Design a protein with these regions (language model features):
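The feature captures the beta-strand-to-loop junction immediately N-terminal to the Walker
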Residues: 49-51
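Short coil-to-helix segment of the ABC ATPase nucleotide-binding domain corresponding to the Q-loop/switch region
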Residues: 99-106
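Conserved ABC ATPase "signature" region
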Residues: 110, 117-135, 187
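Conserved ABC ATPase signature
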Residues: 139-143, 147
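A short, proline-enriched helix->beta-strand linker immediately N-terminal to the Walker B motif
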Residues: 158-162
Length: 273
């Protein structure tokens, strides 16, 4: 099966939702993020890959307003002042254990004092989209890890943010549940085209989900490459895996990433010695 494949050199998006220029983040003598500059377009599904400790999560926390920058600039366009700027989904459970599935999904809307009828409609819609309708009255301890991440996804989309930030949200799941949630996430995203910034260690996941992939170097974290993913949407993982372009993209990204992973491992060994 042959799919159209564009050149690997990606142009900057014309209408940025996020603009980062010469961003540095230091923790004492340690430089975590080193002069990163990039634009992310409205509605783009933007993936970040890099070795452990390269500053990926630090960058995402800065975008979420959870960390400050040392120098540089970030501009986030917010065309709708009634929406929250962002929602963040973390690696582990980030839902409230004392709340039901319904109350977790409704939390952001209630904090914004959205009218109750609207909350009912919106939460009902996203619980249905994530297959959680019949679990609305369950508590997190009654759910599997995959179902808890579905709740986090439902809550994030229900809150209707301008930007969705995702930090390896499926990394703790088994392969089958990970694939199911990837497909569910894409289906919901294709309906609403939120701007998504998604961190992953999986090159396969980056190619399956993303419009464009940023490869980061080992510490200090710099931009090594931007790789476009010109595969048609909607995507089906079974069909993609049959296409030579899919494998070519994975090989191209891994060739860029491999040396950085080795360098990160060497840095870890030096710190231990």
């Amino acid at each position: 099966m042959t799919l159209p494949l564009a050149k690997f050199d990606a142009a900057e998006p014309l209408t940025p939702a996020i603009r980062i220029r010469d961003l540095y983040k230091r923790f004492g003598q340690l430089t975590a993020v080193d002069g990163v500059s990039l634009d992310i377009a409205h509605g783009e599904f933007f993936m970040i890959v890099g070795p452990s400790g390269c500053g990926k999560t630090t960058l995402l926390r800065i975008l979420a307003g959870l960390d400050s920058i040392t120098s540089g600039s970030i501009e986030i366009e917010t065309p709708n002042s009634q929406r929250p700027v962002n929602s963040m989904i973390f690696q582990g459970d980030s839902i409230f254990p004392w709340m039901t599935v319904w109350d977790n999904a409704a939390y952001g809307l209630r904090m914004r004092h959205v009218p109750a009828p609207t909350i009912k409609d919106v939460v009902g819609h996203y619980l249905a989209r994530t297959g959680l309708t019949r679990f609305a009255k369950y508590y997190p301890h009654q759910l599997s890890g995959g179902m808890r991440q579905r709740v986090a996804i439902a809550r994030a989309f229900a809150n209707d943010p301008e930007i969705l930030l995702m930090d390896e949200p499926f990394s703790a799941l088994d392969a089958q549940n990970k694939l199911l949630l990837q497909e569910e996430l894409l289906r919901i995203w294709e309906d609403h085209k939120k701007t998504v910034v998604f961190i992953t260690h999986s090159v396969d996941e980056a190619v399956f989900l993303g419009d464009r992939i940023m490869v980061m170097t080992a510490q200090p974290g710099k931009v090594k490459a931007f790789v476009p993913v010109p595969l048609a949407r909607p995507r089906n993982i079974m069909e993609l895996q049959k296409s030579p372009q899919y494998g070519e993209l994975i090989a191209h990204i891994w060739s860029s990433l491999r040396d950085e992973v080795h360098r990160a491992r060497q840095q870890e060994e030096e710190m231990k010695s």
